[in-house]
Amino acid sequence: MSEICPVCGLPKDLCVCEEVAKEQQFIVIKTGKRRYGKEVTIIEGIDKGEINLEELAKYLKSKLACGGTVKNGVIELQGNHVNRVKELLIKKGFNPERIKT
């Protein structure tokens, strides 16, 4: 028997909560500087209650071949990956009109 979604009450394989959550997110992707002048890509605006940030960060890190972390609801990736991150988020189902770079 499949698990039940706690939000909508439907079985997990029929649940559309995460897809709806992806469409409603307003995401900002920007770059910043860290110690020793290293660049990082910062992704903010994703609701950590609706989308698993750790899982999304792991996906992005593997696709971009870089390190990164999740701190205070913000994903930080080592290096400047603004355009590639936007493409990957669109592939994952996020609304391209609600992603600001």
Swiss-Prot record:
<dbReference type="InterPro" id="IPR050318">
    <property type="entry name" value="DENR/SUI1_TIF"/>
</dbReference>
<dbReference type="InterPro" id="IPR036877">
    <property type="entry name" value="SUI1_dom_sf"/>
</dbReference>
<dbReference type="InterPro" id="IPR001950">
    <property type="entry name" value="SUI1"/>
</dbReference>
<dbReference type="GO" id="GO:0003729">
    <property type="term" value="F:mRNA binding"/>
</dbReference>
<dbReference type="GO" id="GO:0002188">
    <property type="term" value="P:translation reinitiation"/>
</dbReference>
<dbReference type="GO" id="GO:0006417">
    <property type="term" value="P:regulation of translation"/>
</dbReference>
<comment type="similarity">
    <text>Belongs to the SUI1 family.</text>
</comment>
<dbReference type="InterPro" id="IPR005872">
    <property type="entry name" value="SUI1_arc_bac"/>
</dbReference>
<keyword id="KW-0810">Translation regulation</keyword>
<dbReference type="Pfam" id="PF01253">
    <property type="entry name" value="SUI1"/>
</dbReference>
<keyword id="KW-0648">Protein biosynthesis</keyword>
<dbReference type="GO" id="GO:0003743">
    <property type="term" value="F:translation initiation factor activity"/>
</dbReference>
<dbReference type="InterPro" id="IPR022851">
    <property type="entry name" value="SUI1_arc"/>
</dbReference>
<dbReference type="GO" id="GO:0001731">
    <property type="term" value="P:formation of translation preinitiation complex"/>
</dbReference>
<protein>
    <recommendedName>
        <fullName>Protein translation factor SUI1 homolog</fullName>
    </recommendedName>
</protein>
